[in-house]
C-alpha cells in the first residue's frame, strides 16, 4: 500500500488528520464532510487543504461517486445520545446521521474505519442503540471492537471518556470472539456481553492500557493571559475569601472547589482546582472552564492548582449564568495588601519579579502581613482549550490567523476529539493491520 487514502465525515477541525500527521503517517485526504463554515475554515487552515475537498452535507452526498479510500474516520453528532442532549437517539436527525456513515461504508467498502461517540451511547435506550449500530456495521461487512478511552490517560489533563469503535473489513481478518473480562462491571463490558448474544462480527483490537493520569491542568496554562479572560471580582469575591482560608488538594482528579453563583448551585458557576484535571469540555455556547490558582509567596508567581473537565464550546464574551463553565482562578500579587482595588501610579498589580516598594511606617506597599494568598477567577483561553484536546499550538495559531473568533474556537475544541487518544489507536491499527495487509 502506498499512501493511506483517508475520507473524513463530520470532520470538525480534523482531530483524526492531526493524529495521523503527528505519528508521521503518509496519508492522502481524498475528501472531508463538514457543514459548519467556521469549522471548515479552521480545518483547511490547520491541514493546509483547499475547501474544494469538502463534500459538505453528508446526507446529500452521492456515496457511490466518492473517490476510493482505505480508511473512513469520523464520529456522528453525539448530542442525541448524550445526557446533555436529552438522549433522543435515532428520533433526532443528528442521531440518524450515523446511518450516513454506515451507508458510506456499504457503498465504498474501505478496508478500515474508526468511529467515535459519547459514552452514553452504550446504554442509551436500554442498550438498543448500541445493538443497532453494531448490527449495522456487521451487515455491511465489518468486524468490530470497541472500548471506552479516557483522555486523562493519554497525556492530557482532561477527564473525557469516549466510545471508540474500530472496524476492519471482514475479508481481511478472521472472526475472533471478544476476550471479555467478566470481573469488570462497567457499562462497556455489559454492552459487549449483549452484543455477543447478537452474534456480532468481532475481533480483538489491542487497546493502549489506561494506567494513570500524569498531567495537571496547570501544566498547559498560558503564562500570560489577557485581562479580558478574568471574571469581575465582585462576582467572585465570596469564593475567593473562602478559598483563602483553605488549602487546595494536589490530587490528580476533577475537583470542584466552589461555585460563584449567588445560590451556590448550578454547573455554570463551578470552579475547579487547576492542580487536578479539567472536566470534559463541551460545546456550551463557547466559553472556557473556571479554575483556581494559588499564589506562591516563595516564587512570587501564580501557582496553578490538576485534570480539566471535558472541554465545552461556550461564548467567550462576558459570562452570564449560562456562560461560566470554563474559567480559572488565578492569583496576582497586589500593590497594597489591604485593598486590591487601590492603585499606585495608576497600576493595580506589580509585574512578576518587580521589587517591592520600600516599607515605611506610613504605607505597607506589597506587604501581606498575616494575610492569605490572593486568588482570581478566569476562563480558560481558546489556546488552552486547544491544548486540552492535544492540538499543537501551531494548529491554534493557524485557525486564529484564518479569522476564527474566540467563540467559534471554543465551540470547535468542545466538538473535537482528543488527538493523543487517536494517535494511540492509529499506531496499533497501522502497525498490526494496515502494514500487515500491504505486505
Curated annotation (Swiss-Prot):
Q: Which biological process terms from the Gene Ontology are attached to this UniProt entry? A: methylation; symbiont-mediated evasion of host restriction-modification system; symbiont-mediated suppression of host innate immune response
Active-site residues per Swiss-Prot or TrEMBL entry: 78
Catalyzes what?
A: a 2'-deoxycytidine in DNA + S-adenosyl-L-methionine = a 5-methyl-2'-deoxycytidine in DNA + S-adenosyl-L-homocysteine + H(+)
Q: Which UniProt keywords apply?
A: DNA-binding, Host-virus interaction, Inhibition of host innate immune response by virus, Methyltransferase, Restriction-modification system evasion by virus, S-adenosyl-L-methionine, Transferase, Viral immunoevasion
One example of the protein's molecular function in GO is: DNA (cytosine-5-)-methyltransferase activity
Q: Which intervals hold domain SAM-dependent MTase C5-type?
A: 4-436
Q: Which PROSITE patterns is this protein grouped with?
A: C5_MTASE_1, C5_MTASE_2, SAM_MT_C5
Main EC class the enzyme belongs to: transferase
**Protein name per UniProt:** Orphan methyltransferase M.SPRI
Q: What is its EC number?
A: 2.1.1.37
Q: Which InterPro entries match?
A: C5-MTase, C5_DNA_meth_AS, C5_MeTfrase, C5_meth_CS, SAM-dependent_MTases_sf
Its biological function?
Modification confers resistance against restriction enzymes that recognize these sequences.
Self-association or partners: how does it assemble? Monomer.
Keyword DNA-binding assigned to the entry: answer is yes
The Swiss-Prot or TrEMBL record describes its family as follows: Belongs to the class I-like SAM-binding methyltransferase superfamily. C5-methyltransferase family.
Amino acid at each position: 500500500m502506498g499512501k493511506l487514502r483517508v475520507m473524513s465525515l463530520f470532520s470538525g477541525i480534523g482531530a483524526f488528520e492531526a493524529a495521523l500527521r503527528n505519528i508521521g503517517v503518509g496519508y492522502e485526504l481524498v475528501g472531508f464532510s463538514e457543514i459548519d463554515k467556521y469549522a471548515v475554515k479552521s480545518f483547511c487552515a490547520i491541514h493546509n487543504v483547499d475547501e474544494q475537498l469538502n463534500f459538505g452535507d453528508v446526507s446529500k452526498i452521492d456515496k457511490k461517486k466518492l473517490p476510493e479510500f482505505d480508511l473512513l474516520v469520523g464520529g456522528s453528532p453525539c448530542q442525541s445520545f448524550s445526557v446533555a442532549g436529552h438522549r433522543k437517539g435515532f428520533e433526532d436527525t443528528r442521531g440518524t446521521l450515523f446511518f450516513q456513515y454506515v451507508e458510506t461504508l456499504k457503498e465504498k467498502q474501505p478496508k478500515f474505519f474508526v468511529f467515535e461517540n459519547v459514552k452514553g451511547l452504550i446504554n442509551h435506550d436500554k442498550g438498543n442503540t448500541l445493538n443497532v449500530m453494531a448490527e449495522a456495521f456487521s451487515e455491511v461487512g465489518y468486524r468490530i471492537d470497541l472500548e471506552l478511552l479516557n483522555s486523562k490517560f493519554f497525556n492530557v489533563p482532561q477527564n473525557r471518556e469516549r466510545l471508540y469503535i474500530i472496524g476492519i473489513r471482514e475479508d481481511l481478518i478472521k472472526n475472533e470472539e471478544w476476550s471479555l473480562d467478566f470481573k469488570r462491571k462497567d457499562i462497556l463490558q455489559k454492552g459487549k456481553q449483549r452484543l455477543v448474544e447478537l452474534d456480532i462480527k468481532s475481533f480483538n483490537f489491542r487497546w493502549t492500557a489506561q494506567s494513570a493520569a500524569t498531567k495537571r491542568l496547570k501544566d498547559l496554562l498560558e503564562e500570560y493571559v489577557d485581562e479580558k479572560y478574568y471574571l469581575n471580582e465582585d462576582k467572585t469575591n465570596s469564593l475567593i475569601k473562602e478559598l483563602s482560608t483553605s488549602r487546595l488538594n494536589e490530587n490528580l482528579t476533577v475537583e470542584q472547589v466552589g461555585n460563584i453563583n449567588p445560590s451556590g448551585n448550578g454547573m455554570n458557576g463551578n470552579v475547579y482546582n487547576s492542580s487536578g484535571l479539567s472536566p470534559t469540555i463541551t460545546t456550551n455556547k463557547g466559553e472556557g472552564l473556571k479554575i483556581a490558582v494559588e499564589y506562591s509567596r516563595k516564587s512570587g508567581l501564580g501557582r496553578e492548582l490538576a485534570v480539566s473537565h471535558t472541554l465545552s464550546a461556550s461564548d467567550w464574551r462576558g459570562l452570564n449564568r449560562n456562560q461560566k463553565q470554563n474559567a480559572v482562578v488565578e492569583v496576582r500579587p497586589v500593590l497594597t495588601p489591604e485593598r486590591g482595588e487601590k492603585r499606585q501610579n495608576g497600576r493595580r498589580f506589580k509585574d512578576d519579579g518587580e521589587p517591592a516598594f520600600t516599607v515605611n511606617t506610613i504605607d505597607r506597599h506589597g506587604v501581606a502581613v498575616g494575610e492569605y494568598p490572593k486568588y482570581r477567577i478566569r476562563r480558560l483561553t481558546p489556546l488552552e482549550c486547544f491544548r486540552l484536546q492535544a492540538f499543537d499550538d501551531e494548529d491554534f495559531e493557524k485557525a486564529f490567523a484564518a479569522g476564527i473568533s474566540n467563540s467559534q474556537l471554543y465551540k470547535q475544541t468542545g466538538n473535537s476529539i482528543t488527538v493523543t487518544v487517536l494517535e494511540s489507536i492509529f499506531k496499533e491499527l497501522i502497525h498490526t493491520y494496515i502494514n500487515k495487509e500491504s505486505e
